[in-house]
Amino acid sequence: EKDTVDFQLNFDDSEKEPTVLPTRIPNLLINGSSGIAVGMATNMMPHNLSESIDGCIAYIDNRDITIDELMQHVKAPDFPTGGVIYGMEGVKAAMHFGRGRVVVRGKLTVEAKANGKEQIIITEVPYQVNRDALTNRIGELVNEKTIEGISHVNNESNNKEGTRVVIDLKKDAIANVLI
């Protein structure tokens, strides 16, 4: 009606569809996307809302902005489950070429218990890592004797407190070695 965007014929030429879907904010960049089709797949990482808006404003102000200049506004993906991105080379490759390997590690702390044993407390997990699956996998590795020094693993996460995966260590285990 308002002639906002161009239209093109759909896959079977039966009707016209918009070439883009206008929006007030860059939803795809903010929310990310993951999908598989015949012969191709896509994974777009989510980004911070305010950084994304700043990036859009910078692009509007300078249509010839370079990717490096744009990355001063949109610095890196922003994962809803937290975690720490290790190395920016993968992020830079993803921004420049649409492909890149981004390594994300969870956040953890080591706590000493009253009985002298230590616990590893995981408070953030990488994006799309299921906490129950993580807990089960650690348990499997302990049972297979691939990892030694762990006496118990428990997922104490909840909606109120957030992520909390507790790994109890055996008395002689050294947390920094297991990490």
Question: Where do the model's predicted regions map?
Answer:
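Proline-centered turn/helix-capping motifs that create local helix->coil transitions or kinks
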Residues: 1-5
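Intrinsically disordered, low-complexity regulatory segments
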Residues: 6-31, 36-179
